[in-house]
Amino acid sequence: MTILNQQKIDELSIEIGSDNVPVLLDIFLGEMDTYIDNLSQLEGSERLMYLKEISHALKSSAASFGADSLCELAMSIDKKAKSGELVEQGSEVNTMLDRLNETRDAYRSWTQ
């Protein structure tokens, strides 16, 4: 699974106009920064609730921006959350932090 799907990014550019992509991408990058900061600072049940929240939101935003690997992880965590399989001791928080950092860094490299 790729971190960035160039074809989806190109499709987004056609749909919304190439001038709008950098603006929306900046917003998406800002959201990822917020997610990383909050996941890093929260603890226990608050951290788990926040992971559920952002995983649900990331299913669509990551898909829209071609962040395939992040989208796949978000869908997996959201599914676990809905079935009650997500637990505080699980590895999902660290996996999400790693994937958010990888995705953010890949987009920043791509835009330079």
From Swiss-Prot:
Biological function: Phosphorelay protein which receives a sensory signal from a sensor kinase and transmit it to LuxO. At low cell density, a phosphoryl group is transferred from the sensor kinase, probably on His-56 and this phosphoryl group is further transferred to LuxO.
A biological process term (GO) from this entry: phosphorelay signal transduction system
The encoding gene: luxU
InterPro entries: HPT_dom_sf, QS_phosphorelay_intermediate, Sig_transdc_His_kin_Hpt_dom
Protein name, as recorded: Phosphorelay protein LuxU
Superkingdom field: Bacteria
Domain HPt: residue ranges: 17-112
Signal peptide: none
PROSITE patterns recorded: HPT (PS50894)
